């Protein structure tokens, strides 16, 4: 009997304002940020905003038609881009703030190690520190 995918670390998905969040903590933070935006303390609140860390890599190769004549150069993607998807991004006093909601932090886990690399790339590429909530 198929029961679907088990949530990681036992968290339960929560829906607020028709938006499904991965955890109660993330949904609660959304409600807090929404209140701050309504009060005018933050602006331009975005959910799941993507930041490109490493662009896609392409290989250029000459293309030939059936007659053997060279056509315009073609491009083939050999590596997809690497992106970081922030839980929340907003502006406070004109400065971009990026937040990632973390429940249980296990430094030994592969998922957290991947996050640490993306956090460092965000600082290097975009000059933005990620706040862990």
For each of these PLM feature ranges, what is it?
Residues 1-133:
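Electrostatic, structured charged patches in enzyme active sites and in nucleic-acid/phosphate-binding
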């Amino acid at each position: 009997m198929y029961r679907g995918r088990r949530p990681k670390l036992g968290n339960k998905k929560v829906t607020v304002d028709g938006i499904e969040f991965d955890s109660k903590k993330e949904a609660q933070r959304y409600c807090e940020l929404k209140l701050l935006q309504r009060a005018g303390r933050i602006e331009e609140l975005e959910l799941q905003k993507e930041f490109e860390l490493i662009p896609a890599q392409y290989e250029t190769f000459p293309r030939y038609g059936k007659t053997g004549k060279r056509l315009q150069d073609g491009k083939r993607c050999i590596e997809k881009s690497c992106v970081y998807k922030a839980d929340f991004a907003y502006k406070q006093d004109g400065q971009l703030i990026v937040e990632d909601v973390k429940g249980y932090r296990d430094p030994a886990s592969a998922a957290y190690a991947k996050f640490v690399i993306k956090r460092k790339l965000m600082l290097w590429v975009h000059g933005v520190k990620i706040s862990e909530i």
